[in-house]
Amino acid sequence: MSDVAERVKKIVVEHLGVEEAKVTENASFIDDLGADSLDTVELVMAFEEEFSVEIPDDAAEKILTVKDAIDFITANS
């Protein structure tokens, strides 16, 4: 697993308070991990801070799963 993937998963575990085992690449932040809209905004902000990357609103709306976050960060950092 890549460094980016590990760091994304760590942020998700910390922000959503879910078990690490539940944070799979295909896990949906809302449907599988119980996030609400505020949680998703906070996750995006945490990703921006951790990876020093800007995630525009239109891109943030498309980041629905752990893999979406990993792919965006990998492509833009």
Swiss-Prot record:
InterPro entries: ACP, ACP-like_sf, PP-bd_ACP, Ppantetheine_attach_site. Keywords: Cytoplasm, Fatty acid biosynthesis, Fatty acid metabolism, Lipid biosynthesis, Lipid metabolism, Phosphopantetheine, Phosphoprotein. The modification O-(pantetheine 4'-phosphoryl)serine is found at S37. 4'-phosphopantetheine is transferred from CoA to a specific serine of apo-ACP by AcpS. This modification is essential for activity because fatty acids are bound in thioester linkage to the sulfhydryl of the prosthetic group. Signal peptide: none annotated. SUPFAM superfamilies: ACP-like. GO terms for cellular component: cytosol; membrane. Residues 2-77 form the Carrier domain. Belongs to the acyl carrier protein (ACP) family. Carrier of the growing fatty acid chain in fatty acid biosynthesis. This is Acyl carrier protein. It comes from Paramagnetospirillum magneticum (strain ATCC 700264 / AMB-1) (Magnetospirillum magneticum).
